[in-house]
Each structure stands twice: as C-alpha cells, then as structure tokens.
C-alpha cells in the first residue's frame, strides 16, 4: 500500500514554470511527478493560467514571487485594482511615490469607488498591499525622478559589473521600447499641435498604432518592428497573411501594447530570433533585454527563456528617461525616416496631397515604417548606448557613414510638394515630433482607472474586429496578373543595368501565377 503523498504548496514562480512547460508541450502527468503534485493541481494551474500570469506580471519583485504561495485577494478588490493601476502608471512616468502619497490616493479611490464603511489606509494596509503585489519598495525619493544623475552613474556602474559577471558581449545586450505613431499624419499649412494632426479627416485615435523597436547594442541585429493596431484583420490587409508582413503585427482594442502581447512577443519572437542570431555569430545563446518600467512590461520572472539564459532586466524608474537607448535618438530617427519616406513617395507618384492622403492605408504605412527602421544605421543605435556602455560607441566609431536624415532634408522635399511649399520650419519640426511623447501604453485618467477597477467596459472596446478604411474593392484575375509579370520581365530585359536576381524573382513569381491559373482551370 503506497503512502499518502506529502502535500506540496507551490510558489507563484513554480506555477509560472509549470505554465511555460505546459505551453511547450509538457504533459500534466509528467509535471505532476516532477513537482510532486496531483494532476488535478496541474490542470487547475492551466485553467487559471491568465490569472497567474497577470498577477506575476504586475509584481515588482522576482525574489518575492519565489516565496509567495498564494494570490490572496484584498477585502477591497476594486480599491486594490485601482491602486495597482495608479501605482504602475506613476512608476512608469517617473513620478515620486511615498507611503503618505499612496495612503492619500487610496483614500481618494475608496470614496470615488463608492465603497461602504470606514477605511483607514494605515501602515499595515500599505504593507499588505505591497505583499499582495510583491512590491519591493514603495518609498521613492520625493524629488522628480526624471533627472537623477547620481542614480544614473550608480546604475551604469552596476550594469557594467553585471555584464562582466555574466560575460556578455555587446551583441548579447538588447533594448526594446514602445512609442505611438500617428501613421497618417501629414504636414499642412495649418499649425500642427503636439498630439493632434490638423490634416482634414485625420482621426488621431483611429490612425494611431503602437510600435516597439528592439535591437542589440551594436545595432547589427535589429528585430522586425512589433506593431499593435486596433483591428485583428484591417481591411487593407485583404488576403495578406499577417505572417508575411514586414513587421510583427498584433491587435488590441485601443492599439496599445499590453502585458499579454509583450509576453507573446518575448516568448515567440524575441527569444527564438536572438538565439538564431547568436548562433550565427558563434556566441553563447545568452542575452539580456533592458527595459523601462512601462505598465505593459511583465515581471522579470515572466520574461525569461526556459533555460533562463535569455532574460529581462529593468532600468530603475529614476534613470530610464535619461539613458534608455531607444530614446537617445533611435526612435526619433526612425520616425523622421518614415515621414520623409511618405513625402518622397507622394512626390514620386506625382499626386496632390489630398489624393495621396486618401489612398494611404495601414498596410502602406507598415511597409514604410519597416523601411524606415531598416534605414536606421547601426552606428545610430550603438551611439545611443554610450551612456551605459561607452566601449560600444568607441568600438563602432570607425563607421563613417553619412549622417541620418535631417530636418533640412525633409524641408527640401517639402519645397517640391504641391500644397506644402509654404510650411514653416516651426510647423515642420512640430510635425516631425507630433507623437514624440506618445508612450505606447494606455495612460488612464482617474475616472478611467475607477471604471476599469469596477469592471466596466471601455467605450472604445466595440468594433475591434475590423478597422474602417476607405479602400475600393478590386479583384485581379490570374490572367491579368500573368500579363503584368510578362510586361515587367520585358521591361527588365530592356534595362541593361538590371541585375539577374531581379529577373529571377519575377520569373519565379510568373511560374507561381501560372500554376495557380492551371489549378483554377482544373477545378472548374
């Protein structure tokens, strides 16, 4: 007769590890044996997967997750949700947070939520709040966090020591950061106000996406841009498979990055692509991803490969705005490339602004922003790391490439664009920076925090399935497509300077279309 199995109480970290193993194809039976638990417990963990991940993602401490064994809720759950949302936003924005500030805010939310009874945000309540959400420290110095030069020096020294201990090369050190992009915002003679575009018909919310760029410290490995739009399948995509897009596309009802999307990106895109790159360079498959404290970035314990060799590390909130590499001109250069590219396309097509504006779709924008990211030079990225890793900038200083596109270059394009000849330098600069302060994550007002804490749906949650774009439906049959490839091949043959690979690509495309045409005829 077998003895009774000893009761095992798993930590939150254990549950996260089990979830990862289940996602990678592990069986409930095997995991039950490994962790000394029943299969029912494993199934319960699978069932509560999202709740566990959300809880861990909002935690401030990996070490506390390794100790904490329950997700015991607060007796004031709505207040707890509101306070956590508020706390994460304040930390991300670099605002000072202290015990008294938290207590005052908790009292405000308690009454704003219409909760009954007396509430005393005592030191005991604050301690329990920190424990519930694995927050290491809530008291951050009472000065504005966005300019702490001493903290910058301390972090940089500690980070360099960390890199040396882990034996990491610049090729193994990455940074990712989100930003909002008003993809259909064009300059006009009317003044451009930061955060709003004045071109007739522009809808800043509808025509905004979140973009996340990620590259290593050498700038030699740039991952495809991660783009978050509102619609799962925008009309402009038509039959385009999202896997074939020049970006990694995700959807969210407000076109914001969120915890779930970031985790998917990390597990399914970042980790595999980094492994592949490091393997190609003959380097150990080990890397660190440096992040800021955005509310959409999960806990370090969640952002970790199965073998623990690829992981995330966070910039302290009081230094992120000063040294985050992507914010040191990388994102700004990409956006400038994008907008200059739009103007150049308009110029080459010979359209007036109104016609170009009407035809521009999200799909067009994705190809253009991908091109803009490709045009960001490795040296631009490596220089952005000079505050954290001076040796990287020195190593890359031999790159004597031409400078990135300037405001003067964009102004020169404007001079040849009908309807934009008189745009002032001031308006041009405002247009180029119109979304420079867009964070890429949703910043909630107090009233929005309250509605969310009460479980009320956002007004913007409707119609998330399909994005409205005025695109004329057009059906192109196989015969027409085949004729176009024939014409294009004739053109390439006439051009003496066209290289052989270009012609081979078109010939391959022609063969594919012919096969499709034959299959269609045989099925009729």
Curated annotation (Swiss-Prot):
HTH CENPB-type domain location, by residue?
67-139
Q: Which GO terms describe its cellular component?
A: nucleus
Q: Name one GO molecular function term.
A: DNA binding
| A Gene Ontology BP annotation from the UniProt entry | central nervous system development
Is this entry keyworded Transmembrane? no
Organs and tissues of expression: Abundantly expressed in the majority of tissues examined, including brain and skeletal muscle.
Q: Which InterPro entries match?
A: CenT-Element_Derived, DDE_SF_endonuclease_dom, Homeodomain-like_sf, HTH_CenpB_DNA-bd_dom, HTH_Psq, RNaseH_sf
Residues covered by the DDE-1 domain: 168-385
Compartments, as annotated in UniProt = Nucleus
Q: What residues does the HTH psq-type domain cover?
A: 1-52
UniProtKB keywords:
DNA-binding, Nucleus
What Pfam family is a match, any one? CENP-B_N
Q: Which residues bind DNA?
A: 28-48, 100-132
Q: Which family does it belong to?
A: Belongs to the tigger transposable element derived protein family.
Stated name of the protein: Jerky protein homolog-like
What organism does this protein naturally occur in?
Homo sapiens
Gene coding for it: JRKL
